[in-house]
Amino acid sequence: MKFVDEATIYVEAGKGGNGCLSFRREKYVPKGGPDGGDGGDGGSVILEADESINTLIDYRYTRKFKAANGESGRGGNCTGASGADLVLKVPVGTTIIDTDIDEVLGDLVEVGQQIKVAQGGFHGLGNTRYKSSVNQAPRQTKPGQPGESRNIRLELKVLADVGLLGLPNAGKSTLIRGISSAKPKVADYPFTTLVPNLGVVRVQAHRSFVVADIPGLIEGAADGAGLGIRFLKHLVRTRLLLHVVDVSPLDESDPVESAVKIVAELEKFSPALAARDRWLVLNKTDLLAEDEKEAICADILKRLNWSGPSYEISALAGEGLQRLCQDIMTWIERRAEEERDDPEVAEADRLNREQMDQEVRERIQFLNEQRRLARKKAKESDDDDDDEDVEVFYAP
């Protein structure tokens, strides 16, 4: 199934049913009085997080959704039936944004979590409601109210504890294959990974974490180059970033320069995301000569001026993976405990996530607008070229 992580849809709640104008008609009851019932409420539109869905493809081609209207009231004080709510299932991790006012309506991060995006219209009132001592035969009713309508954008960000970051062919997919049951495609050409892949890493029976692998970044990614820019937003929800560096690249490029480029693109895309906890993972060390391995890795750390955690692994050979996974699990558990015990830490993390969301959203909107303008300019240029090629002949 095609992976779609963005969609724009129009939702409209149902209209409330109209109130009924009716009077009691019964033998030997010449003045039965009003008996018009109220209408039913219109159905609302609700979004619900469903763990069985992992893409927004259902909303890419069907753009309009409307809930049922409420039924009108009837005589005999019969109330009309309410319109059924329309429940739209979306993947866990979906953010809902009102595009008309550019406001985030909610974030569905738990299975079964719901958010009402369009309230159904209030029911109309029958003429019974207007009966009084001075108006015993009212002919007044009230129509049902229209339901709310919105243009909303759905943005899916995968839920993972750890995100893999690096250039194409750095070995990220091989790493996720080596530490989890996920089996992404692996090959020796760039951009083998086209969509995010998730894998569950089980350290022990009841200790596990989720890791996300996104397409590799290249220089200029923050300006729209390559595939990685489309999926960098999926790293927003992660707690920890693993920067995977190929210490023995096939093109003989400098690993340090490559690592610096990735960090620069990350900072340009979102400073808050770049400030996230990040560990350095030096991959493919099995390709280095045994007597040179330690010196080469130490030189990379020195030139990067790296002071954080670093690991030397071979994802293909499985070297160093167990220690890496154990340390990640311990860090995640310790971090979760700190957030649980210290409200200030939890609040700081929440604010940081909001800042990342805002920066990522603004950057993606800017790039989308740039692409739209570029397409418009290219189309206008093509039209001008076509006009210049036209020759007009006048027949006598």
Curated annotation (Swiss-Prot):
Gene3D superfamilies: GTP1/OBG domain, P-loop containing nucleotide triphosphate hydrolases. It is an enzyme of class 3 (hydrolase). Its EC number is 3.6.5.-. One of its GO terms (cellular component) is cytoplasm. It comes from Hahella chejuensis (strain KCTC 2396). Residues 160-333 form the OBG-type G domain. This is GTPase Obg. Residues 347-356 have a biased composition (Basic and acidic residues). Residues 1-159 form the Obg domain. It is found in: Cytoplasm. Keywords: Cytoplasm, GTP-binding, Hydrolase, Magnesium, Metal-binding, Nucleotide-binding. InterPro entries: G_OBG, GTP-bd, GTP-bd_Obg/CgtA, GTP1-OBG_CS, GTP1_OBG_dom, GTP1_OBG_dom_sf, OBG_GTPase, P-loop_NTPase. GO terms for biological process: ribosome biogenesis. Residues 381-396 have a biased composition (Acidic residues). GO terms for molecular function: GTP binding; GTPase activity; magnesium ion binding. Monomer.
